[in-house]
């Protein structure tokens, strides 16, 4: 049959109902079709890319229609053989019912072509809709022939593969280094009418790099200390740490830590052992106002000391390592107020004093060490006579930094009322009961003996009587 040419503007786009009620029903019942535009081709003996050349309608819509006879896989079976030379058609999804005027007229099955042999076939973009006629639509003359032909719509779906996205990396921040790797790929594959499969891995890695430095790194600390500057006591504004902040992952965590510092009643103390400075009245007054002992909240361990106070409670530790490589030798100046009227002299480096005091404790100290000076040789000489300046050479070897947060331990006690056990002892009453029981037992024993003797006599008499009666019956 020669290809049919349609006038310009005409397209062959029948619906599912039209394909079954008109074309397939007339083909099975042997009725005439006005325009023979659907050829009869054995689809399971041809490859799908050869089918466009067998179509009678030249179409640019990438859609072709064919009548295909049914090829049984087994002679006595009902399964259809859908294997070709280069691959096979595999059914996907469930069979859908096609209705017309609220009446089932047929079924629609979706199949996908795979290259190779099952189960290792490669999926392609060729799709086929197989229409079959319902048994109720067959005429009596064609009864049982509803499976003789199937009307197939063959088309090819275009597989769309999206390009992978570019990898984006965020800029390095002073304390937090964040890098993200985003790559995605999506593919538009064929299954039924529309199938989309995507694979979008998302991997985000965050690296936190703390910064340590000398006294010149105070400016880097301003980014973190600005969150602590608000709602803090003004007497501690001069203290600071030359090093970077703790291991914080974001500014949100920093703000949470700031809130924790603000709600505490006292700030962490600092203990300096083996110091030759005198404990002043000012430090004692601060110790009384704190209302807590020295190592309640924070503990700073210098040199090789790894002991910290009250380790039996739940502590949250923050450890900063890699501090063994850096050692600082600095000259610190301790300015201690003295309210004594007799002490009015100021001593600089190299001075001598007669008073030697040990074990100074400075409470309510915000940072874990004094703020480093920009110039080692710069000395500040106060004009007031109430201050004393003591020059010390302190060698600090930073080993470990431990921050602890203690929680209260609640103990519950249960008071159980005492129980009283009363015991009554009456030996006289017990002896009377024993004597009464013995008398009753003695009476019962004599009566029982008499009763037993009477029973024995009666048994003997009954035995003699039975023997006598037996003898009489034998004689007579």
Curated annotation (Swiss-Prot):
The record's PROSITE patterns line, in alphabetical order, gives: NAC
Kindly list the GO molecular function terms attached to this UniProt entry.
Answer: DNA binding; DNA-binding transcription factor activity
Residues the UniProt record assigns to the DNA-binding region sit at: 105-163
What's this chain's function? Transcription factor directing sieve element enucleation and cytosol degradation. Not required for formation of lytic vacuoles. Regulates, with NAC045, the transcription of NEN1, NEN2, NEN3, NEN4, RTM1, RTM2, UBP16, PLDZETA, ABCB10 and At1g26450.
Tissues expressing the protein: Expressed in a few sieve element cells before enucleation and in phloem-pole pericycle cells.
Q: Does the keyword Cell inner membrane apply?
A: no
- Kindly give the PANTHER family that the UniProt entry links to this protein: NAC DOMAIN-CONTAINING PROTEIN 86-LIKE (PTHR31744:SF210), PROTEIN CUP-SHAPED COTYLEDON 2-RELATED (PTHR31744)
Which UniProt keyword terms apply here?
DNA-binding, Nucleus, Transcription, Transcription regulation
Mind telling me which Gene3D superfamilies this protein's record contains? NAC domain
Query: What GO cellular component entries does it have?
Result: nucleus
Record note on domains? The NAC domain includes a DNA binding domain and a dimerization domain.
SUPFAM superfamilies registered for this protein in UniProt: NAC domain
Q: Please give the name of this protein.
A: NAC domain-containing protein 86
> Where does it live in the cell?
Nucleus
Which effects follow disruption of this gene? Answer: No visible phenotype, due to the redundancy with NAC045 (AC A4VCM0). Nac045 and nac086 double mutants exhibit seedling lethality with defective development of the protophloem sieve element.
What is the species of this protein? Arabidopsis thaliana
Q: Which GO terms describe its biological process?
A: sieve element differentiation; sieve element enucleation
Residue ranges of every copy of the NAC domain listed in the record: 6-157
Top-level taxonomic group: Eukaryota
Q: Main site of residence?
A: nucleus
InterPro entries in UniProt: NAC-dom (IPR003441), NAC_dom_sf (IPR036093)
